[in-house]
UniProtKB/Swiss-Prot annotation:
Source domain of life: Eukaryota
Native species: Helicosporidium sp. subsp. Simulium jonesii (Green alga)
One Gene Ontology cellular component annotation held by this UniProt entry: plastid
Gene Ontology biological-process entries: tRNA modification
InterPro entries (UniProt xref): Rossmann-like_a/b/a_fold, TilS/TtcA_N, tRNA_Ile_lys_synt, tRNA_Ile_lys_synt_N
Primary gene name: tilS
Gene3D superfamilies xref list: HUPs
Function, as annotated: Ligates lysine onto the cytidine present at position 34 of the AUA codon-specific tRNA(Ile) that contains the anticodon CAU, in an ATP-dependent manner. Cytidine is converted to lysidine, thus changing the amino acid specificity of the tRNA from methionine to isoleucine.
Similarity section: Belongs to the tRNA(Ile)-lysidine synthase family.
Protein name: tRNA(Ile)-lysidine synthase, plastid
Location of the protein in the cell: Plastid
PANTHER family: TRNA(ILE)-LYSIDINE SYNTHASE-RELATED
Enzyme nomenclature, EC number: 6.3.4.19
Domain remark text: The N-terminal region contains the highly conserved SGGXDS motif, predicted to be a P-loop motif involved in ATP binding.
Length: 280
C-alpha cells in the first residue's frame, strides 16, 4: 500500500519536470534529500535530462564526515556528478554559524554552482512542509518580517557576484577532482564593476549573465516529515542521521522538538499537518 502511494507521488512529481531539464539536486544523505533523489532517479531516466548532486560540508561536527562519505558513495554507485561545497569561515575565530548565516551560505552556494553549468539548472531542494512551517514560526517568534515568498513551492533568486571554493567530481567521464577558482574573500579575483578577470579558469563565466534568476523548486512541500520517515523506512534508504537536529541550542530545533509536540498534545495530533495546508 505504501509503495503504491510512493509511486503515485513520483507520477505527480513528473508534472514539475519538462522534457529536457538540467537538475541540480541538493543532497545531504538525510531522509528528505535521499527520498528526493530516489524520486528523481526514477523520473529522470532518459538521455535528454541531466542530474547533478551538491553537498554542503559544514565541518561543524564530527558526524558530518559520515554524510560526506555517504554522498560520495551514492554518487559513485549511480554515476551521478557530485559537487562538494566547503565551509569557508574560520572555525578558530568563530565556533558557530547562526541559523540565518548557515541558510544564506547554503543558498548562495547553490546559486554560485549554477554558474558552473553549461545550461541553466533547476535547483531541487528536499524541503518538506514541516520545514516551511518551522520557517514560519521561526520568523514569527523572532518578531521579524515574514516573507511569504519563502513559503511558496518555487523561488527565484539572484546569482551572487562572487564565486567560492568548489570541488567537482564527474564520475561519468573521469575520477579527477578539480578545485574551481579561489576563495571569495580574495578581492583580487573580482573587479570593482563585478566583471570576472580574464584568464583561462574564468573564461566560461564571462559568458554568464550574472543578473539572471535561478529557479529553486521544493517538490516535497506537500509531504510531512513523518510521511518521509515512513517512506524511507519502507524503502530501506541508507540515510545518515544528523545529530545536530536533536540539539535544542538551535532555535528551529526547539520549534521542532518542543513546540510542535506540545501543540499535538494540547490541540490535535495532526495540528502541524493541518497548519502546513495554509501555505500550499
Amino acid at each position: 500500500m505504501l509503495k503504491n502511494i510512493i509511486y503515485s507521488y513520483i507520477t505527480q512529481l513528473k508534472n514539475l519536470l519538462s522534457k529536457k531539464l538540467n537538475v541540480l539536486c541538493t543532497f545531504s544523505a538525510g531522509q528528505d534529500s535521499f527520498f528526493l533523489l530516489y524520486c528523481l532517479i526514477h523520473i529522470i531516466s532518459n538521455k535528454n535530462n541531466k542530474i547533478k548532486l551538491q553537498h554542503n560540508h559544514h565541518f561543524l561536527q564530527s558526524s558530518n564526515i559520515l554524510s560526506f562519505w555517504q554522498c560520495i558513495k551514492v554518487a559513485s554507485i549511480f554515476k551521478i556528478p557530485l559537487v562538494i561545497n566547503l565551509l569557508e569561515i574560520n572555525l578558530a575565530n568563530k565556533d558557530f554559524m547562526t541559523e540565518n548565516e548557515a541558510r544564506k551560505w547554503r543558498y548562495d552556494s547553490f546559486l554560485r554552482n549554477s554558474l558552473f553549468q553549461n545550461e541553466k539548472p533547476s535547483i531541487f531542494i528536499g524541503h518538506t512542509g514541516s520545514d516551511l512551517l518551522e520557517t514560519f514560526f521561526w520568523h514569527f517568534l523572532r518578531n521579524s518580517i515574514i516573507d511569504y515568498q519563502l513559503i511558496k513551492k518555487k523561488l527565484l533568486w539572484n546569482i551572487p557576484y562572487y564565486i567560492s571554493n568548489f570541488s567537482s567530481v564527474g564520475y561519468k567521464n573521469s575520477s579527477k577532482v578539480k578545485i574551481k577558482l579561489t576563495n571569495k574573500k580574495k578581492k583580487i579575483n573580482c573587479l570593482i564593476n563585478h566583471n570576472l578577470m580574464l584568464n583561462k579558469a574564468k573564461k566560461s563565466f564571462l559568458k554568464k549573465d550574472l543578473t539572471q534568476l535561478v529557479l529553486i523548486t521544493r517538490p516535497l512541500v506537500n509531504l510531512h516529515r513523518q510521511d518521509i520517515f515512513l517512506f524511507r523506512k519502507n524503502l530501506k534508504l541508507p540515510v545518515i542521521t544528523d545529530k545536530s537536529n536533536d540539539n535544542n541550542y538551535y532555535y528551529r530545533n526547539r520549534i521542532r522538538n518542543i513546540l510542535f509536540p506540545i501543540m499535538r498534545i494540547l490541540f490535535n495530533k495532526k495540528t502541524d499537518k493541518n497548519l502546513i495546508k495554509l501555505f500550499l
